Amino acid sequence: MELETKIYGNALNQIAELGPISLMRLLKYFSDFETAWNAGPKDLALAGLSSKQISAIVAAKARLNPEHSWQQMERAKINMLVAGEKDYPSLLLETAAPPPILYVRGDVKVLNHLAVAVVGTRKMSLYGKRAAQEIVAGLVVNNIAIVSGLAYGIDAEALITTLNNQGRPIAVLASPIDNPSISPRVNYNLAQKIIESGCLVSEYPLGAAVQKQNFPIRNRIIAGLSAGTLVIEADIESGALITAKYALDQNRDVFAVPGSIFSPVSRGTNDLIKQGAKLVGSSFDIIEALNLDGVIETAADLSLEETEDERFVIEYLSHEPTHIDDLIRRVNRQTGKVNAILTVLEMKGRIKNLGGGNYVKLR
């Protein structure tokens, strides 16, 4: 994609009167944002803009310096993707209202990796935390990227677990993604770690105000980047349910973790299941529903045959983390023997050591 269309697209995106639908109209009508920026009022009207929007563009040309704005973005190490270019996420482009412009910090290639969204309440219980840790770990070791917001609670826990398991985290923000704008500030350090292994994403340019309505609008991107959306703990009015609604509208799978009928943060997830969301008790439920198990099995080297002891141990492992103490009790073998078998199986690519004595089966 030509640099000029990005420079002028970024400038147009700073005009508050132009939302994503109007920007997409300009892109489709003029084919590039540079031509749209230089267009006169008559052509802008033909592109479908209102008189108020046209006046806003005329006024913006007098106060905005597109090249200067672009240089500010480069200094903040922010990449920009325009709908239709090679690295723009293909799943997101399939949705009804894809953002014409995405700002990215980190690895843009991650945006086209197979991903599942994991969202939920800020008021996470211990049950929700454990569910997030175990299910996300199982997805990550099966080479699935995790998409979420950056809110504390389930969102942050999903991203932290992804990082702890050397996965690919994608955080979609409702604010600009330069360091001073990252929100919430309590997760600033988490955001920096995400940039190293995955990416931060937003449709908002530098200097954009963080408004309340940004958050539900942002949720369409979380769902749009993902093959499916998992909700772990959500009350009836939780924003996570908005993400699930977007996923349904985008014809994507919706998954939910059931919870106690006495827990307020399980009312939303239990209701989703009543409405037809797929009940999830482990990461395998998601892998199976998305028809990914066959793909995962072919990824490992099938030429390395296992011994009888190795096969015996593998039978007691699954796609969910199993602690070595539990494994030793199940297989009724000495600790040293089990440790040796696990080491060999990891070398063969059959299992993964998640740390903390936890192991998962890779195929």
Residue ranges and their predicted role:
Residues 1-86, 256, 350, 355-358, ...:
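Short, small/acidic-rich helices and loops at N termini and domain boundaries
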Residues 2-5, 82-363:
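Glycine-biased, small-residue-rich flexible motifs in mid-sequence functional cores and linkers
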